[in-house]
Amino acid sequence: MKYYIFDLDGTLADSMGYWYGSFREDERYDHERMQQVRLAMKEKYAEIIQPRPGALELLERLYSEGAVMCIASATDRWVSEPFMKKFGLDRFFRFYLDCTEAGAHKDKPDIFLQAAQRLGASIAECTVVEDSAYCAETAHNAGFRVIGIYDPNTAPVSYTHLRAHETAANLV
């Protein structure tokens, strides 16, 4: 059986430009400002964010092949749930695990380890699909197979520098 742990923003959802556009550089790590943006984003996420090209087709193919998949995202589930339902993405995934629920950000492997455990899979059986270089590195260092997906909004360096076993420019 194949197990996949997907990131959402920048990997399946074309949302990173919006997230980064919502902050000035000095606000990016301000907790209060992050909460304000999350609340605003919940209202707009399903309206303005689209799936990345090829996302639905890839998920449909993997699902039809019997893959077992989940979401492991820094974005709180309550923010992205309307988007997931609008585009029917929720039907492909066993569960949605966010960093708040996991108790740590993606600079620590907790979310990936908990996702594998909830899938009933070993680390060696799971593939993590990520756009973020630091998240890909975290998963890689924890022993996961990693596929890095390039998103120009999150990759200040070439996606070939991701700590990934494979990289792709898109999901098509």
Indicate residue ranges for each PLM-predicted region:
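Active-site neighborhood of HAD-like aspartate-dependent phosphohydrolases
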Residues: M1-E27
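Helix-loop "lid/cap" segments that line or gate small-molecule binding pockets
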Residues: R24-R28, E32, Q36, F83, ...
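Short, basic/glycine-rich phosphate-binding loops at helix/coil junctions
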Residues: R33-M41, Y96
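Short, acidic loop-to-helix structural element flanking the phosphoryl-transfer center
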Residues: K44-I71, R77, E81
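Substrate-recognition "cap/lid" segment bordering the active-site pocket of phosphatases
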Residues: C70, D76-T127, A133, E137, ...
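Acidic, Mg2+-coordinating phosphoryl-transfer loop and its flanking beta/alpha structural elements
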Residues: V128-Y159
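Conserved small/polar residues in nucleotide/adenosyl-binding loops
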Residues: T160-T167
